[in-house]
Amino acid sequence: MMGHRPVLVLSQNTKRESGRKVQSGNINAAKTIADIIRTCLGPKSMMKMLLDPMGGIVMTNDGNAILREIQVQHPAAKSMIEISRTQDEEVGDGTTSVIILAGEMLSVAEHFLEQQMHPTVVISAYRKALDDMISTLKKISIPVDISDSDMMLNIINSSITTKAISRWSSLACNIALDAVKMVQFEENGRKEIDIKKYARVEKIPGGIIEDSCVLRGVMINKDVTHPRMRRYIKNPRIVLLDSSLEYKKGESQTDIEITREEDFTRILQMEEEYIQQLCEDIIQLKPDVVITEKGISDLAQHYLMRANITAIRRVRKTDNNRIARACGARIVSRPEELREDDVGTGAGLLEIKKIGDEYFTFITDCKDPKACTILLRGASKEILSEVERNLQDAMQVCRNVLLDPQLVPGGGASEMAVAHALTEKSKAMTGVEQWPYRAVAQALEVIPRTLIQNCGASTIRLLTSLRAKHTQENCETWGVNGETGTLVDMKELGIWEPLAVKLQTYKTAVETAVLLLRIDDIVSGHKKKGDDQSRQGGAPDAGQE
């Protein structure tokens, strides 16, 4: 039987790689992704300019925003990009560090795989190290008083210093803190801070960044439906609808056969009566403003205008929800079911202004707004987009601290403290596992090392003295000053990071490294059609998965 030709199990147009080749390929892909955004860490970080497929320009130093725009082929690189997105959604900050750490964890593992150490041994050491990293972090964390605004501004400032918005840091910190405190909502002892839904960022090009502010209420890009309606109302009574003030057409197509001329007049009269009834149901409650998600017919506008009611139509559902939270109104589906307690009376002012070429409706001075709008002004769209990304990060940091008021020192100090603890612990370990365990400590040093590199200081000299510093008693808050590249005590410098962000960064980085080390086989399949097309000179990537 030995002379027979081999049996092909896999289809001929699939490509298979296995063993060491796959592992080193995965590690190299992860290292490449980490190298792309290595220069984006710290206050002296560089920015990247990316062209998206539509020809738009993105200028940013936010790890997640950069990787979102990059097109990659390798599956391991795709999973690296995925973790930065997860980090952004979970805690909103630390997207750059998580990629750099994961890349470094894999990089130090390569040496052991070359020495024929089994990946499972490396993985089990990494898992042990992760548990110890988490316990060490909790040991060095300190509680924070969230009612102390100076401390809160300081924490947000640590996050903003590394961003493009750092020139206007005090303005940005105040905006982030005010916005998050405004949307904070406590119910049955449970805190809810939903920034995505209730803190909307509106960007209007023009003016200067210093004109940006937080509105105690909502701003929408809409004008009144009829030019003679009021555009300035104090203490407005607001009614919110999600139904249209138009004549309802039947669900399916209906034909009406008319035999007499009067019947046609009667049909038109019925339409008018229906709309009049809708408007009367609304007018009974004496509102000043009616806002609906659907359309308002000309006739309805006429009735509302005669009753001196301002109407705004086709408002987004998300905006309507925010207005409801801000002024205490309820969104009603049928005008005939409107009651007095559905009317929102919490707003202090409704005003429609023209900014540039467009009209904007401002519902502000709300008594107890649980929703807000951040109005950003700036020179160009690119700058505004970057400022918005930075603000989102700052708000997430603020939210994390309010939900879990624990802090750890920034500037690479926590990494060095954890690395020192792991190195000490590894001395008591026996067997092969101690080497990969110690390598995790070595991998953690990549954060302070990158900070030093990015501000152009001498890496070897500073890292050695930082290691020496951490061997002394009560020196776990010493780290790198990213501005000057010198060693400082983070307590004095006031650079703190939320514990939640650090924990998530470490967990995600180690889990990703473990996941990629577990892979020993990659089978990539292509559809036959795509291959045929590329042979004929068609689109090379058509039909490929």
From Swiss-Prot:
Binding sites annotated in the UniProt record for Mg(2+): D93
Similarity remark: Belongs to the TCP-1 chaperonin family.
Phosphoserine PTM positions: S11, S170, S243, S244, S252
Pfam families documented for this protein: Cpn60_TCP1
Modified residues (Phosphotyrosine): Y247
UniProtKB keywords: Acetylation, ATP-binding, Chaperone, Cytoplasm, Disease variant, Disulfide bond, Hydrolase, Intellectual disability, Isopeptide bond, Nucleotide-binding, Phosphoprotein, Ubl conjugation
EC number: 3.6.1.-
Disulfide bonds: C366-C372
Taxonomic source organism: Homo sapiens (Human)
Record's signal peptide: none
Enzyme class: hydrolase
Disease: Neurodevelopmental disorder with speech or visual impairment and brain hypomyelination: An autosomal dominant disorder characterized by global developmental delay, impaired intellectual development, poor or absent speech, and brain abnormalities including hypomyelination, cerebellar atrophy, and optic nerve atrophy. Some patients have severe visual impairment, dystonic movements, and seizures.
GO MF annotations in UniProt: ATP binding; ATP hydrolysis activity; ATP-dependent protein folding chaperone; protein folding chaperone; RNA binding; unfolded protein binding
Residues annotated with N6-acetyllysine modification: K222
Cell compartment(s), UniProt: Cytoplasm
Residues noted as binding ADP in the record, renumbered to the chain: G42, G94, T95, T96, S97, T162, K163, G411, G482, E483, E497, K502
Binding site for ATP: G42, G94, T95, T96, G411, G482, E497
Modified residues (Phosphothreonine): T430, T459
Name of the protein this chain belongs to: T-complex protein 1 subunit gamma
PTM sites of type N-acetylmethionine: M1
Gene Ontology CC entries for this record: cell body; chaperonin-containing T-complex; cytoskeleton; cytosol; extracellular exosome; microtubule; zona pellucida receptor complex
